[in-house]
Regions:
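Short acidic/polar active-site loop segments enriched in Thr and Asp
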Residues: 10, 61, 176, 233, ...
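Active-site beta-loop-alpha junctions enriched in small/polar residues
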Residues: 17, 46, 183-185, 211-215, ...
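Radical SAM enzyme core and accessory elements
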Residues: 5, 9, 38, 56, ...
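Flexible glycine/acidic-rich beta-alpha junction loops that bind and position SAM and/or redox cofactors
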Residues: 50-52, 140, 189-190, 245-250, ...
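Catalytic cores of alpha/beta
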Residues: 52-57, 223, 283-298
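Acidic, low-complexity intrinsically disordered segments
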Residues: 1-172
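Short helix-capping segments at alpha-helix termini
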Residues: 33-38, 200-206, 300-305
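Radical SAM [4Fe-4S] cluster-binding motif and immediate context
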Residues: 112-272
Length: 409
């Protein structure tokens, strides 16, 4: 977008779907206000209502979350007939809307070409990737998930014809693979499955990936062959940890045994599972982290897990349901408005040191283009996980499809 558009706009709306986007907005807002002090500023998306008070202190006048499209349209209409200074002090648009909407096909005019985004690597070739969503929100209440404070166990569908038309325009633009960005593709399987069946019918060569929680992989195991038959290449699943006690704290709805069963089912179906993890939590012990590394080795998952997944630290944003656990307040510090989270420390200080060391190691070794196996071995040694098996099962990464930008789930 040319900067002159920012200087001349009456309304500037910033999409804040994730933590990183919100932090980037913090760095940008002073420049925006200096360039156009009279514009009406709006923050919308998942992280907007969670940080409502902070955004308003920064100069944002309207904050919209949940199903935000109608609210954005209403705001734009009001501004078209009313000067910014004459708008009501309190916004009439709901802070969080759960309204069922009739969506329009997204207008992607002016966006960068698909080649500018993350690519898919599979079978030694690279494919251009498109993105769409068949639903928003989630039926579940995992305590650590940023979707939950906004949607509170609700999900909303995007109409099938809108999803397919969005895919259609991206295929015309060169997409060879589609990532479905739904928080959980199986929140509504009777909605989701017909979409991928129609996708495969119209574009037999088009592949796709989805995100599905372990609990749904188990409960809807009969649908896994449908995913395979319609060209699903892999499924991302937020496993988070292999420690059952921590899984209980997070209210994930599965156990380590359940994850291992889901992994077995996926492999039997011929589908790749891409698990994501949060290995560093306030409850993580040193032995639990070492066992986590051993399990990745035993389950032959080293090549399926991006190294950064071995270093992720639990994020506690404003509104996190984890803050409802009384024990958390003894572990956290006051809210950090720059980091947009509550800092915390492990009871065993060695874990905090290890987390930092693992993050630095990964950053350094990825710059050196070290393989996942090489990085994993160094993390193993850093954690003093024991003697590394000389006969460790190695799976060639060339056989596992992956996106060039790892998914932080």
């Amino acid at each position: 977008m040319p900067w002159t558009a920012v200087e001349e706009a009456d309304l500037l709306a910033f999409f804040l779907p994730m933590h990183t986007a919100t932090r980037l907005f913090q760095k940008l807002i002073d420049k925006v206000l200096a360039a156009n002090p009279h514009a009406h500023l709006c923050g919308y998306g998942l992280y907007a209502p969670m940080n409502d008070a902070l955004l308003r202190r920064l100069g944002v006048q309207t904050v919209i979350g949940g199903e935000f499209e109608q609210g954005l349209s209403d705001l734009a209409r009001r501004l078209s007939v009313t000067r910014a200074g004459e708008l009501p002090y309190r916004q009439p648009e709901p802070l969080v809307s759960m309204a069922r909407q009739q969506f329009r096909v997204p207008d992607r005019t002016g966006l960068p070409a698909l080649g500018a985004y993350a690519q898919l690597v599979t079978g030694g070739e690279t494919r251009r990737v498109g993105y769409t969503e068949a639903s928003h929100g989630c039926k579940h209440l995992c305590r650590h998930c940023p979707v939950v404070p906004v949607y509170r166990g609700l999900f909303r569908i995007v109409q099938r014809d809108v999803v397919l038309q969005d895919i259609r325009q991206q295929v015309v633009a060169g997409a060879q693979h589609i990532t479905f960005g739904d928080p959980d593709f199986f929140n509504g399987p009777r909605h989701a499955v017909p979409i991928v069946e129609a996708l495969h019918s119209e574009w037999p060569e088009l592949t796709y990936d989805v995100t599905i929680k372990v609990e749904h992989l188990l409960n809807h195991r009969e649908l896994l062959p449908v995913l395979k038959a319609t060209n699903c290449l892999f499924v991302t699943s937020a496993v988070e940890t292999l420690d059952d006690a921590v899984l209980g704290k997070l209210a994930k709805g599965h156990t380590r045994a359940g994850f291992e069963e889901a992994l077995r089912l996926m492999r039997a179906t011929g589908l790749a599972l891409s698990p994501t993890f949060i290995p560093f939590t306030p409850w993580t012990t040193l032995e639990a982290y070492r066992e986590f590394l051993r399990a990745l080795l035993d389950l032959e998952l080293v090549e399926q897990v991006a190294p950064i997944q071995l270093a992720i630290r639990l994020l506690l944003p404003e509104g996190s349901l984890l803050l409802e656990l009384s024990e958390m307040w003894a572990r956290i510090q006051p809210f950090d408005t720059r980091a947009l989270c509550y800092p915390w420390q492990n009871a065993d200080g060695r874990l905090d040191v290890l987390c930092t060391s693992v993050q630095e190691l990964i950053k350094r070794e990825e710059r050196r283009r070290k393989s996942r196996w090489e990085i994993f071995r160094q993390i193993w040694d850093l954690a003093e996980a024991g003697e590394f098996p000389v006969d460790a099962p190695m799976v060639s990464r060339a056989t596992i499809p992956y996106l060039t930008e790892p998914w932080y789930c």
